[in-house]
């Protein structure tokens, strides 16, 4: 406004409810909708009869391939996952590490104020965060507890019923597989990271594709490698719009810092994620562009 924008260019609802959101989207004064949120909200935006740009959820894997520069890869993952307490939708939800460098990875990441839960603590963490323990009878009903979103690792641990050092940045949990049986391989929007071992390159890529297809279609996937051919194979296999190579996925996904992606916190997932856009949404998507077609005998 101080720079000359219209006085009412930014408005908001004090009343937080689906009814209020629906009423706003259907208001005759609204021309276009940019919807960022859960699948239900995005679907509602698309069905309200107006032009809508909806973006989807992410479930981002970081494949740590054996040829990577390991100290850099670990630093990138910690830097990315700890930023804003893991709230960015492009942040890593699981590190998938080749078996040849798994022990070295574990040793390196523990230098960064990262806490690995034991079996009992993992069950407590799953119960608090998702209401279900891995491989339990009700595991398919697991649903993220919204109270954990953006909370510090120390708070999450305390609420789950165990203690971590006061300077803990990230809570890590070793998981056996990707999918409903392991709730911590879901999107967590918090400084909690699943860690899985890959038997070989094909297994690492398979687990990464499973992560993306486990409620994160079209969003993002990261790989740390010095093998360009493996990077290409990974990119072709993952149904993700953004393939982030050798960079923190949070900052790689939202663009500008580590690559040439358009800077944005609104990340389209394309047809993979049932979105109308597949790019990083910016002002270009929200303006009308007039064109004059002057006669030219081509």
Regions found by a protein language model. Give the residues of each.
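Rossmann-like NAD(P) dinucleotide-binding subdomain of oxidoreductase/dehydrogenase enzymes
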Residues: 1-72
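General beta-strand structural signal in soluble alpha/beta enzymes
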Residues: 9-14, 34-37, 52-55, 97, ...
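Buried hydrophobic positions in well-ordered alpha/beta secondary-structure cores of metabolic enzymes
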Residues: 10, 33-34, 58, 98, ...
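Conserved active-site and cofactor/substrate-binding residues in soluble primary-metabolism enzymes
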Residues: 15, 19, 28, 36, ...
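Short, surface-exposed amphipathic charged segments that create phosphate/polyanion-binding patches used
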Residues: 24-28, 69, 131-144, 184-186, ...
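Short glycine-enriched loop/turn motifs at secondary-structure junctions
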Residues: 27, 55-57, 87-91, 186-191, ...
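ALDH superfamily catalytic-core signature
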Residues: 42-179
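Conserved C-terminal structural/oligomerization subdomain of aldehyde/semialdehyde dehydrogenase
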Residues: 162-298
């Amino acid at each position: 406004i101080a720079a000359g924008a219209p006085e009412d260019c930014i408005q908001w609802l004090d009343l937080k409810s689906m009814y209020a959101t629906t009423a706003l989207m259907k208001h005759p004064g609204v021309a276009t909708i940019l919807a960022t949120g859960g699948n239900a909200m995005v679907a509602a935006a698309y069905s309200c009869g107006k032009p809508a740009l909806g973006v989807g959820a992410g479930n981002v894997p970081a494949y740590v391939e054996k040829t990577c520069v390991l100290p850099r890869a670990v630093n990138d993952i910690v830097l990315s996952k700890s930023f804003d307490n893991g709230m960015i939708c492009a942040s890593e939800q699981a590190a998938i590490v080749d078996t040849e460098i798994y022990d070295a990875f574990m040793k390196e990441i523990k230098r960064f104020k990262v806490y690995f839960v034991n079996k009992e603590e993992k069950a407590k963490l799953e119960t608090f965060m998702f209401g279900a323990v891995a491989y339990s009878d009700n595991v398919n009903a697991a649903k993220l507890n919204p109270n954990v979103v953006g909370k510090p690792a120390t708070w999450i641990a305390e609420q789950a019923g165990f203690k971590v050092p006061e300077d803990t940045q990230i809570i890590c949990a070793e998981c056996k597989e990707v999918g409903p049986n392991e709730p911590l391989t879901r999107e967590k929007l918090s400084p909690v990271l699943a860690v899985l071992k890959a038997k070989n390159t094909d297994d690492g890529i398979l687990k990464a594709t499973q992560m993306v297809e486990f409620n994160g279609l079209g969003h993002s996937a990261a790989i740390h490698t010095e093998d360009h051919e493996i990077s290409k194979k990974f990119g072709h296999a993952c149904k993700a719009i953004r393939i982030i190579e050798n960079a923190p996925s949070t900052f790689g996904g939202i663009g500008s810092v580590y690559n040439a992606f358009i800077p944005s916190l609104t990340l389209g997932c394309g047809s993979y994620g049932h979105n109308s856009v597949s790019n990083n949404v910016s002002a270009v998507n929200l303006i009308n562009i007039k064109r004059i077609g002057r006669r030219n005998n081509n």
